[in-house]
Curated annotation (Swiss-Prot):
Gene Ontology BP, a term: DNA-templated transcription elongation
Function: Necessary for efficient RNA polymerase transcription elongation past template-encoded arresting sites. The arresting sites in DNA have the property of trapping a certain fraction of elongating RNA polymerases that pass through, resulting in locked ternary complexes. Cleavage of the nascent transcript by cleavage factors such as GreA or GreB allows the resumption of elongation from the new 3'terminus. GreA releases sequences of 2 to 3 nucleotides.
Stretches of the chain forming a coiled coil according to its record: 8-28
Gene name linked to the record: greA
Protein name: Transcription elongation factor GreA
Protein family per UniProt: Belongs to the GreA/GreB family.
Record GO terms (molecular function): DNA binding; RNA polymerase binding
Transcription is among the record's keywords: yes
Signal peptide residues on this chain, from the entry's feature table: none
Domain of life: Bacteria
Amino acid sequence: MELNKNYLTEEGLKQLEAELEHLIQVKRPAIIKLLQEARDQGDLSENADYDAAKAQQGEIETRIAEIQDILANVKLINESQTKKANKVTLGSTVEIYDYSSKTHEKYTIVGALEANPEEHRISNESPLAHAIYGRLVDDECDVVGIEVPYRVKIVKIINW
């Protein structure tokens, strides 16, 4: 994995591009209109509408800059390479057995921007992903870098 890259699935990339387009094409023009309307009210020193619109404009511009920075450093998770892999890699869905809790869990390894623990989508930067990355079915490893380390076994690898 390359450092300083934002790993995204094709779906994640499309979502970010759509958000950026919406911010630039819809939200930015709307806030500019609100600012103009607030300016037309006169004295800006005590104009709450102007202050609120200015704050909202700052949030929009910050998010636009964030997305542009993400897209400038994006690396797509290559679906065709993931399919061919027989080991855990970005995009893999992995079934593990946790020896400490005696449970089976499935996780998909995605870039940090798409991680969602509730959906069992874990960041490639997480301790679990670090422990299992590059490993094969039946490999056992220790998950460290957390308060209570634990041992897991890779039961199954599903590469899209």
